[in-house]
Amino acid sequence: MKEKITGIVLSTVRHSDRHNVTGVYTRERGRMAFLTPAGASRQSRQTAACFQPLSVVEAQVSVNPTRELHIPSAVARAEVWRTIYYEPAKMTVAMFLSEFLGRLLHDSPAEPSLWDFIMQSIKLLDTIDDEASIANFHITFLIGLMRLTGIFPDLSAYSEGMEFDMKSGRMALPFSLQGGVRGMRIDARRTSFLPKLVRISYANCHRFRFNGRERSEILDDILRYYGCHFPGCDRLKSLDILKEIFA
């Protein structure tokens, strides 16, 4: 029996001459893989328009838990974004977030709170027009997502000169005094940004005035932190383009 599925598009890769595999995070079933048409036919072009990064689609799907690939039918947009695919900065953010979420949610079950956060975030990205908010949007998203993935940093013991231990998610004495694994630490200079950074939200992100170097370093550290807990999240093809756009 077919189910009505609503999903956020995360990735599309070529499967054969006739088909793509589209990764979708669905409200009802969590991560799913759809087999979608490829090529130059009218149907393929119409389908491709629905399956852009962070598109939200509705489809009828015969769900079989033993199958990796599902064939959707009656595919339609559940939301129509006004600006994301027409403004280069927003499109770059969408490509980055879809790639990141594709790594993070590669086998995730349905989680209503996570779905709602992602969905509301995309809606906000489509409506904001303040340059500072757009430039800081991906950082704000990644910080907010930490609460839902269980890795929000514990900075309660912070004092000047301390480092951040990414493995434990807590403050630590400098590596030179305490030892440990250097690659799992954020140094004292960059750690000094954290108490301010974790207070960032969609409501106040326009007030955070980072220069290009600061924004790049902050993003690198955030992705390294995610990578410590969710392997692969720190190796993204879209990262360099994102940094260039917001340099």
Which role fits each region the language model picked out?
Residues 1-21, 25-247:
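Non-catalytic alpha-helical scaffolds and adjoining flexible linkers that form interface surfaces
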